[in-house]
Amino acid sequence: KYWILSNIYNKKSELKQAYFGDSYLGVLIAKVVESHGIDFIDNPEYNDTSYNGLKIRLGLISSLLCLADTLDCDNRRVYIDKLTHSEIPDYSKIHWFKHYYVNSILIRNNIVTIYYCFPDISKNDLENYKKYFTYQTEYWINYCETKYEKYFETINLNFKIVSHYETSREKCALSKVNFEYIQE
């Protein structure tokens, strides 16, 4: 938000192309960007507004951004070599492994289909992976759907989540410590 707002008044800024040089539109875009990190539900700044005679549904746009970020949780966001060799807390590693084990997420006709790919491990361990990582992924999708329901119902957006699983010998397994973490 700060970056956008500071560039609105900078005459030499190239960012003005992002909001067509219109400072009011720039402020609206900054609000949507900011919404990604705050609880905006009851904030009147996110009520519907207008721009050049058009209705702008800031709350809905902000809700869709939060949902989009939640759905952008696949393995394209993970560098497994860095993850397995980095010194970050276990809970953070587990968060990124959640992304690593999601091959893709597709949305069609209000059905969210999540394609997981886990390492080729014992059946019992695989069930633990499925249970933990499916729950974590679905939790955040359901959280967004519930939290932003007042916005999503205006566009008839609700979800059914379907999960598909496969295994691969090329997928890295969790370390013993991380595996114990997901079993707690």
Regions found by a protein language model. Give the residues of each.
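C-terminal effector/catalytic modules and regulatory tails appended to multi-domain proteins
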Residues: Y46-E184
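Histidine/acidic-rich helix-loop-helix segments that form or flank divalent-metal centers
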Residues: Y2-T84
